[in-house]
Amino acid sequence: MAEQPVDLSDQALADAVSAVRRAFDGASTLEDLAKAKTEYLGDRSPIALARQALGSLPKTERADAGKRVNVARTEAQTAYDERLAVLRAERDAAVLVAERIDVTLPSTRQPVGARHPITILAERVADTFVAMGWELAEGPEVETEQFNFDALNFPPDHPARSEQDTFQVAPDGSRQVLRTHTSPVQIRALLERELPVYIVSIGRTFRTDELDATHTPVFHQVEGLAVDKGLTMANLRGTLDAFARSEFGPQGRTRFRPHFFPFTEPSAEVDIWFPDKKGGPGWVEWGGCGMVNPNVLRACGIDPEVYSGFAFGMGLERTLQFRNGIPDMRDMVEGDVRFSLPFGVGA
Protein backbone atom coordinates (compact mmCIF):
# COMPACT_ATOMS: atom_id res chain seq x y z
CA MET A 1 0.00 0.00 0.00
CA ALA A 2 1.47 3.32 -1.06
CA GLU A 3 2.23 5.88 1.63
CA GLN A 4 -0.06 8.90 1.78
CA PRO A 5 1.66 12.09 0.64
CA VAL A 6 2.62 14.47 3.44
CA ASP A 7 0.59 17.65 3.62
CA LEU A 8 3.02 20.62 3.72
CA SER A 9 0.42 23.34 3.59
CA ASP A 10 0.47 26.22 6.07
CA GLN A 11 -2.68 24.88 7.73
CA ALA A 12 -1.25 21.38 8.12
CA LEU A 13 1.94 22.72 9.71
CA ALA A 14 -0.05 25.01 12.01
CA ASP A 15 -2.21 22.05 13.08
CA ALA A 16 0.92 20.01 13.78
CA VAL A 17 2.36 22.78 16.00
CA SER A 18 -0.97 23.12 17.83
CA ALA A 19 -1.01 19.37 18.50
CA VAL A 20 2.53 19.60 19.85
CA ARG A 21 1.59 22.44 22.20
CA ARG A 22 -1.46 20.56 23.50
CA ALA A 23 0.61 17.44 24.13
CA PHE A 24 3.39 19.29 25.93
CA ASP A 25 1.03 21.47 27.97
CA GLY A 26 -0.84 18.34 29.01
CA ALA A 27 2.29 16.68 30.40
CA SER A 28 2.18 16.97 34.21
CA THR A 29 5.52 15.30 34.94
CA LEU A 30 8.96 15.20 33.39
CA GLU A 31 8.37 11.56 32.48
CA ASP A 32 5.15 12.43 30.62
CA LEU A 33 6.95 15.24 28.82
CA ALA A 34 9.73 12.89 27.71
CA LYS A 35 7.15 10.52 26.19
CA ALA A 36 5.39 13.40 24.42
CA LYS A 37 8.70 14.61 23.02
CA THR A 38 9.39 11.22 21.49
CA GLU A 39 5.96 11.22 19.84
CA TYR A 40 5.84 14.83 18.63
CA LEU A 41 9.50 15.65 18.03
CA GLY A 42 10.85 12.19 17.26
CA ASP A 43 11.84 10.71 13.90
CA ARG A 44 8.24 9.60 13.12
CA SER A 45 6.54 12.78 14.30
CA PRO A 46 4.47 14.82 11.80
CA ILE A 47 7.04 17.60 11.66
CA ALA A 48 9.91 15.14 11.15
CA LEU A 49 7.98 13.48 8.30
CA ALA A 50 7.38 16.91 6.76
CA ARG A 51 11.15 17.55 6.75
CA GLN A 52 11.73 14.20 5.09
CA ALA A 53 9.14 14.99 2.40
CA LEU A 54 10.95 18.15 1.30
CA GLY A 55 13.21 16.12 -0.94
CA SER A 56 10.28 14.98 -3.08
CA LEU A 57 9.16 18.50 -3.91
CA PRO A 58 10.08 20.29 -7.10
CA LYS A 59 13.07 22.58 -6.67
CA THR A 60 10.93 25.61 -7.23
CA GLU A 61 8.78 24.76 -4.18
CA ARG A 62 11.44 23.22 -1.96
CA ALA A 63 12.96 26.44 -0.54
CA ASP A 64 9.66 28.00 0.51
CA ALA A 65 8.36 24.77 2.01
CA GLY A 66 11.66 24.25 3.86
CA LYS A 67 11.36 27.66 5.54
CA ARG A 68 7.81 26.94 6.69
CA VAL A 69 8.76 23.50 8.04
CA ASN A 70 11.74 24.96 9.93
CA VAL A 71 9.51 27.63 11.49
CA ALA A 72 7.09 24.92 12.61
CA ARG A 73 9.92 22.82 14.03
CA THR A 74 11.35 25.82 15.91
CA GLU A 75 7.93 26.60 17.42
CA ALA A 76 7.53 22.98 18.50
CA GLN A 77 10.99 22.92 20.09
CA THR A 78 10.26 26.21 21.89
CA ALA A 79 7.03 24.76 23.26
CA TYR A 80 8.97 21.79 24.59
CA ASP A 81 11.68 23.95 26.18
CA GLU A 82 9.12 26.19 27.89
CA ARG A 83 7.20 23.24 29.35
CA LEU A 84 10.45 21.57 30.42
CA ALA A 85 11.48 24.70 32.35
CA VAL A 86 8.09 24.85 34.09
CA LEU A 87 8.14 21.18 35.11
CA ARG A 88 11.72 21.40 36.38
CA ALA A 89 10.85 24.46 38.47
CA GLU A 90 7.85 22.61 39.93
CA ARG A 91 10.03 19.59 40.71
CA ASP A 92 12.70 21.72 42.42
CA ALA A 93 10.07 23.56 44.45
CA ALA A 94 8.60 20.25 45.59
CA VAL A 95 12.04 19.02 46.63
CA LEU A 96 12.63 22.17 48.64
CA VAL A 97 9.34 21.69 50.43
CA ALA A 98 9.97 18.00 51.08
CA GLU A 99 13.51 18.56 52.34
CA ARG A 100 12.93 21.80 54.20
CA ILE A 101 14.50 22.23 57.62
CA ASP A 102 12.37 23.48 60.45
CA VAL A 103 14.70 26.01 62.06
CA THR A 104 12.40 26.21 65.07
CA LEU A 105 13.18 22.63 66.09
CA PRO A 106 15.69 22.20 68.93
CA SER A 107 19.16 21.35 67.68
CA THR A 108 21.06 18.20 68.51
CA ARG A 109 24.09 19.27 70.52
CA GLN A 110 27.33 17.70 69.39
CA PRO A 111 29.98 17.00 72.02
CA VAL A 112 32.80 19.52 71.84
CA GLY A 113 36.33 18.51 72.69
CA ALA A 114 39.31 20.59 73.73
CA ARG A 115 42.99 20.65 73.00
CA HIS A 116 45.00 18.43 75.31
CA PRO A 117 46.56 20.35 78.21
CA ILE A 118 50.01 19.01 77.29
CA THR A 119 49.63 20.61 73.86
CA ILE A 120 48.55 23.87 75.45
CA LEU A 121 51.50 23.78 77.86
CA ALA A 122 53.98 22.98 75.07
CA GLU A 123 52.80 26.04 73.15
CA ARG A 124 53.11 28.20 76.28
CA VAL A 125 56.66 27.01 76.88
CA ALA A 126 57.59 27.62 73.25
CA ASP A 127 56.16 31.14 73.42
CA THR A 128 58.13 31.84 76.60
CA PHE A 129 61.49 30.99 75.07
CA VAL A 130 60.77 32.55 71.69
CA ALA A 131 59.98 35.77 73.58
CA MET A 132 63.47 35.52 75.13
CA GLY A 133 65.03 35.27 71.67
CA TRP A 134 65.53 31.50 71.56
CA GLU A 135 64.76 29.30 68.55
CA LEU A 136 62.68 26.13 68.36
CA ALA A 137 64.43 22.97 67.17
CA GLU A 138 63.10 19.52 66.29
CA GLY A 139 64.55 16.08 65.67
CA PRO A 140 63.50 12.48 64.92
CA GLU A 141 61.89 10.29 67.58
CA VAL A 142 63.72 7.21 66.27
CA GLU A 143 67.35 8.01 66.96
CA THR A 144 70.74 6.42 66.54
CA GLU A 145 72.75 5.53 69.62
CA GLN A 146 75.36 7.95 68.29
CA PHE A 147 73.10 10.94 68.89
CA ASN A 148 71.14 9.53 71.83
CA PHE A 149 74.14 8.32 73.86
CA ASP A 150 77.62 8.51 72.30
CA ALA A 151 77.70 12.21 71.45
CA LEU A 152 76.25 13.00 74.88
CA ASN A 153 79.21 11.41 76.68
CA PHE A 154 77.38 8.28 77.85
CA PRO A 155 79.97 5.51 78.40
CA PRO A 156 79.38 2.19 76.58
CA ASP A 157 78.40 0.44 79.82
CA HIS A 158 75.99 3.11 81.05
CA PRO A 159 72.79 1.45 82.38
CA ALA A 160 70.59 3.81 80.35
CA ARG A 161 71.68 1.93 77.20
CA SER A 162 70.15 -1.36 78.39
CA GLU A 163 66.81 -2.73 77.29
CA GLN A 164 65.61 -2.28 80.87
CA ASP A 165 65.65 1.49 80.32
CA THR A 166 65.54 2.05 76.54
CA PHE A 167 63.24 0.84 73.77
CA GLN A 168 65.49 -0.83 71.19
CA VAL A 169 64.38 -0.72 67.57
CA ALA A 170 64.61 -4.04 65.66
CA PRO A 171 66.61 -5.55 64.13
CA ASP A 172 69.22 -6.25 66.77
CA GLY A 173 72.42 -4.39 66.12
CA SER A 174 70.70 -1.57 64.22
CA ARG A 175 71.87 0.88 66.92
CA GLN A 176 68.54 2.61 66.64
CA VAL A 177 66.44 3.45 69.67
CA LEU A 178 63.35 5.43 70.57
CA ARG A 179 64.94 8.56 71.94
CA THR A 180 65.06 8.60 75.73
CA HIS A 181 65.32 12.41 75.87
CA THR A 182 65.25 15.33 73.46
CA SER A 183 68.97 15.95 74.00
CA PRO A 184 69.86 14.50 70.55
CA VAL A 185 68.17 17.58 69.10
CA GLN A 186 70.82 19.67 70.86
CA ILE A 187 73.66 17.68 69.28
CA ARG A 188 72.13 18.06 65.83
CA ALA A 189 71.75 21.80 66.43
CA LEU A 190 75.41 22.16 67.39
CA LEU A 191 76.47 20.26 64.27
CA GLU A 192 74.17 22.11 61.88
CA ARG A 193 73.93 25.69 63.18
CA GLU A 194 76.30 28.59 63.41
CA LEU A 195 77.35 29.73 66.88
CA PRO A 196 76.06 31.15 69.12
CA VAL A 197 73.18 28.71 69.65
CA TYR A 198 70.12 29.28 71.81
CA ILE A 199 67.56 26.56 71.12
CA VAL A 200 64.69 24.87 72.93
CA SER A 201 63.31 21.48 71.86
CA ILE A 202 59.92 20.14 72.90
CA GLY A 203 58.78 16.64 72.00
CA ARG A 204 57.92 13.08 72.92
CA THR A 205 60.43 10.78 74.57
CA PHE A 206 60.28 7.09 75.46
CA ARG A 207 61.49 5.01 78.39
CA THR A 208 60.56 1.56 79.66
CA ASP A 209 58.72 2.87 82.71
CA GLU A 210 55.52 1.38 84.06
CA LEU A 211 52.49 3.62 83.81
CA ASP A 212 51.56 4.84 87.28
CA ALA A 213 50.63 8.05 89.06
CA THR A 214 54.06 9.63 88.52
CA HIS A 215 55.53 7.81 85.49
CA THR A 216 54.57 7.07 81.90
CA PRO A 217 56.55 5.25 79.18
CA VAL A 218 55.80 8.02 76.68
CA PHE A 219 56.20 11.55 77.96
CA HIS A 220 57.09 15.02 76.75
CA GLN A 221 60.29 16.88 77.50
CA VAL A 222 61.38 20.45 77.09
CA GLU A 223 65.12 20.88 76.82
CA GLY A 224 67.11 24.03 76.33
CA LEU A 225 70.66 24.57 75.12
CA ALA A 226 72.72 27.74 74.98
CA VAL A 227 76.29 27.82 73.65
CA ASP A 228 78.05 31.15 73.46
CA LYS A 229 81.15 32.91 74.71
CA GLY A 230 81.24 33.59 78.44
CA LEU A 231 78.14 31.69 79.61
CA THR A 232 78.12 30.66 83.28
CA MET A 233 75.90 28.97 85.85
CA ALA A 234 74.50 32.44 86.61
CA ASN A 235 73.06 32.60 83.08
CA LEU A 236 71.56 29.14 83.56
CA ARG A 237 70.01 30.10 86.88
CA GLY A 238 68.55 33.31 85.48
CA THR A 239 67.03 31.47 82.52
CA LEU A 240 65.39 28.83 84.71
CA ASP A 241 64.09 31.41 87.17
CA ALA A 242 62.46 33.29 84.28
CA PHE A 243 61.00 30.02 83.00
CA ALA A 244 59.67 29.14 86.46
CA ARG A 245 57.99 32.52 86.88
CA SER A 246 56.36 32.22 83.45
CA GLU A 247 54.78 28.88 84.42
CA PHE A 248 54.15 29.22 88.14
CA GLY A 249 53.72 32.95 88.58
CA PRO A 250 55.61 35.25 90.95
CA GLN A 251 55.96 32.44 93.51
CA GLY A 252 57.98 30.41 91.00
CA ARG A 253 61.40 29.83 92.60
CA THR A 254 64.15 27.34 91.84
CA ARG A 255 67.06 25.85 93.70
CA PHE A 256 69.96 23.73 92.49
CA ARG A 257 71.22 20.51 94.09
CA PRO A 258 74.52 18.96 92.94
CA HIS A 259 74.01 15.93 90.74
CA PHE A 260 75.68 14.00 87.91
CA PHE A 261 74.77 13.87 84.23
CA PRO A 262 77.20 12.59 81.57
CA PHE A 263 76.57 15.53 79.26
CA THR A 264 76.95 18.40 81.76
CA GLU A 265 79.72 19.35 84.20
CA PRO A 266 79.01 20.69 86.75
CA SER A 267 75.48 19.28 86.93
CA ALA A 268 72.51 19.94 89.17
CA GLU A 269 68.97 18.88 89.75
CA VAL A 270 66.45 21.72 89.67
CA ASP A 271 63.83 21.93 92.40
CA ILE A 272 60.76 24.11 92.18
CA TRP A 273 59.00 25.67 95.16
CA PHE A 274 55.62 23.96 95.45
CA PRO A 275 53.17 25.75 97.79
CA ASP A 276 50.52 23.01 97.43
CA LYS A 277 52.79 20.08 98.18
CA LYS A 278 51.14 17.33 100.20
CA GLY A 279 52.14 17.85 103.80
CA GLY A 280 52.78 21.55 103.33
CA PRO A 281 54.77 23.88 101.05
CA GLY A 282 58.19 22.63 100.03
CA TRP A 283 60.69 21.92 97.26
CA VAL A 284 60.03 19.21 94.66
CA GLU A 285 62.27 17.94 91.88
CA TRP A 286 61.53 19.61 88.53
CA GLY A 287 64.36 18.63 86.17
CA GLY A 288 68.08 18.55 85.50
CA CYS A 289 70.60 21.09 84.28
CA GLY A 290 74.27 22.02 84.13
CA MET A 291 77.09 23.44 82.07
CA VAL A 292 77.68 21.56 78.81
CA ASN A 293 80.44 18.99 79.25
CA PRO A 294 83.58 19.99 77.29
CA ASN A 295 83.63 16.49 75.78
CA VAL A 296 80.22 17.15 74.23
CA LEU A 297 81.45 20.43 72.74
CA ARG A 298 84.55 18.73 71.32
CA ALA A 299 82.41 15.96 69.78
CA CYS A 300 80.58 18.71 67.88
CA GLY A 301 83.78 20.42 66.74
CA ILE A 302 83.53 23.31 69.22
CA ASP A 303 86.52 24.56 71.20
CA PRO A 304 85.57 24.52 74.92
CA GLU A 305 88.35 27.03 75.60
CA VAL A 306 86.46 29.60 73.53
CA TYR A 307 82.82 28.65 74.01
CA SER A 308 80.82 27.47 76.99
CA GLY A 309 77.22 26.45 77.29
CA PHE A 310 74.44 25.37 79.58
CA ALA A 311 71.58 22.91 79.16
CA PHE A 312 68.46 21.96 81.06
CA GLY A 313 65.53 19.63 80.70
CA MET A 314 62.28 18.80 82.44
CA GLY A 315 59.09 16.88 81.74
CA LEU A 316 55.96 18.66 80.60
CA GLU A 317 53.74 16.16 82.40
CA ARG A 318 55.52 16.85 85.68
CA THR A 319 55.32 20.59 85.07
CA LEU A 320 51.58 20.28 84.41
CA GLN A 321 51.15 18.28 87.60
CA PHE A 322 52.75 21.02 89.68
CA ARG A 323 51.11 23.90 87.87
CA ASN A 324 47.55 22.53 87.90
CA GLY A 325 47.56 20.23 90.90
CA ILE A 326 47.01 17.00 88.95
CA PRO A 327 47.64 14.06 91.31
CA ASP A 328 47.72 11.21 88.80
CA MET A 329 49.76 11.31 85.57
CA ARG A 330 47.60 8.56 84.09
CA ASP A 331 44.83 11.11 83.57
CA MET A 332 47.04 12.75 80.95
CA VAL A 333 47.33 9.68 78.72
CA GLU A 334 43.95 7.94 78.94
CA GLY A 335 42.25 10.23 76.40
CA ASP A 336 39.21 11.11 78.51
CA VAL A 337 37.85 14.39 77.16
CA ARG A 338 36.48 15.19 80.61
CA PHE A 339 40.08 15.68 81.71
CA SER A 340 40.88 18.12 78.89
CA LEU A 341 37.70 20.19 78.99
CA PRO A 342 38.43 22.16 82.20
CA PHE A 343 41.61 23.50 80.62
CA GLY A 344 39.60 25.11 77.82
CA VAL A 345 40.44 25.45 74.15
CA GLY A 346 42.58 28.51 74.74
CA ALA A 347 43.79 27.92 78.28
Curated annotation (Swiss-Prot):
Residues given in the record as Mg(2+) binding sites: 265
* Parts of the chain that traverse the membrane: none
- Superkingdom in the source lineage: Bacteria
Is Metal-binding found in the keyword set?
yes
- Alphabetically ordered keywords of this record: Aminoacyl-tRNA synthetase, ATP-binding, Cytoplasm, Ligase, Magnesium, Metal-binding, Nucleotide-binding, Protein biosynthesis
PROSITE patterns registered for this protein in UniProt = AA_TRNA_LIGASE_II
Q: Name one GO molecular function term.
A: magnesium ion binding
Q: Could you tell me what reaction this enzyme catalyses?
A: tRNA(Phe) + L-phenylalanine + ATP = L-phenylalanyl-tRNA(Phe) + AMP + diphosphate + H(+)
Q: What is its main location?
A: cytoplasm
Q: Do you know which Pfam families this protein is assigned to?
A: Phe_tRNA-synt_N, tRNA-synt_2d
Its top-level enzyme class, in one word, is ligase
Query: Which GO annotations describe the biological process of this protein?
Result: phenylalanyl-tRNA aminoacylation
Stated name of the protein: Phenylalanine--tRNA ligase alpha subunit
Q: Which organism is it from?
A: Mycolicibacterium gilvum (strain PYR-GCK) (Mycobacterium gilvum (strain PYR-GCK))
Q: What is the lineage of its organism?
A: Bacteria, Bacillati, Actinomycetota, Actinomycetes, Mycobacteriales
